[in-house]
Amino acid sequence: MIEFKHLSFSYDSHGEQEAGQRSEDLQDINLTVHDGECVLLTGRSGCGKTTITRLVNGLVPHFYPGKLCGEVLLDGRNVSEIPMYETASLVGSVFQNPRTQFFNVDTDSEIAFGLENRAFPREQIEEKVANAAKDLKIENLRGRNIFSLSGGEKQKIAFASVYAMNPSVYLLDEPSSNLDMESVASLQSHLKMLKSQGKTILIVEHRLHYLMDIADRIIVLNEGRIKKDYSAREFLSLSDEERRSMGLRTTDLRKELPLVTSGKEQETWLEPKNVSLFYKKKAVLENINAKFSQGEVIALVGKNGVGKTTFSRALCGLHKEIKGDFLRDGRIISKKTRQKISYMVMQDVNYELFAESVKAECSFGIKNPDANLVAETMAALELTPFSERHPGTLSGGQKQRLAVAVGQICKKELILFDEPTSGLDYESMEKVAKIVRKLSEQGKILFIVTHDYEFFCRTCSRMLVFSDGEIHCDLQCRAENKEEIRQLFFSAAGEK
């Protein structure tokens, strides 16, 4: 059993956060999670959800220092007094960014890492690694270089490394953020299996639809406090308006319909012609031919590892192993030119945040930045209160919004977003969608790698489905295509 008793916590000024009251800080949390319960923690980005998980696994206060009042009890023992090695044997954590918890360069070693630290015999380690891969249906990922994995595949390995250790408590922070629909369905199945085994599960999540028949309780946080503790039945009875007023996303994707466009033919501005992409001389995508016009918002859809991010990197001149040409207005453009005219919001935005403050990041590397545009964009994405904060101190969703802000401010002609809604609540997703629509109206070409159907329906005018190394389908978002698009979006990832 996990118990929070009048728990308040504020990050130390020398720790991850800056001094002063922050929304990530917690105030007077009283919460009991019984053995075998699955509890969903949700709420606006930066409201303290991740901090709660850090208190359970002991990272607060052992790794993240701060002012701690009250108690967190794990089976009756104060977590702050339990040695970290002992807590780690009881509590398994999958972080929001799985890259931050990897210690090895190959997948088998990563899955085995926790078992090795607990001094299991070699034979047992090999058996547990094999069983974890089999149970989680990721045998195809064994023996792989971690750096070659997609974001979704990395999340699967992080989950497997925890599953192999068989903890009694699972802490999952945004576990679906980079997963395709098939993988989300698999995650759903894994969670049901863990529940049947009597495991205790705490899930931090914005994407709620796949958890509605799993979660026993839904805890909504707001500015570091528990706003409401719902039973599953109570939560499902909320209206869309009530849910959205708390910054929460849809519970039923079937209600979402794609944006309908006019479908008018426009002049081709960008054209990949007979393009093939390789990774370490192995073909990823072959013979890609397509035509794109200014103002289009194109969704790149398909299973984890199919090559969506590789195609995005090639579009903006960041991928080396390539055959074929890219044409702009009918003329071949070089890799260097593509780099100049494009900007990419990466799947892991930590790779592209360089400045010492949020405000400085918004104009970092941009010649003659428009001060008014910087201020307007920061305000639109609710980044103004954090203007003097270091980007590294932001929550995952806040970092995502910051990277999107730079995408608007840089005034590039070609903008690529790789999973831009990872870690975003409903309101933040709507704000990013508004930015995307505005950029489209300005004549930019936008490509969005996404598994987020809710976001897709608010932004995209066209969908490219990648499968088996090629463009499997290319559909405009027209009225007559609505149902086909919905089915394709899900079936492209294996879910009906």
Task: Mark where each language-model region is.
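Conserved ABC ATPase signature
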Residues: 145-149, 153, 390-394, 398
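Conserved ABC ATPase "signature" region
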Residues: 123-141, 371-386
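Helix-to-loop junction immediately C-terminal to a conserved catalytic motif
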Residues: 57, 316
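H-loop/switch region of ABC-family ATPase nucleotide-binding domains
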Residues: 205-206, 450-451
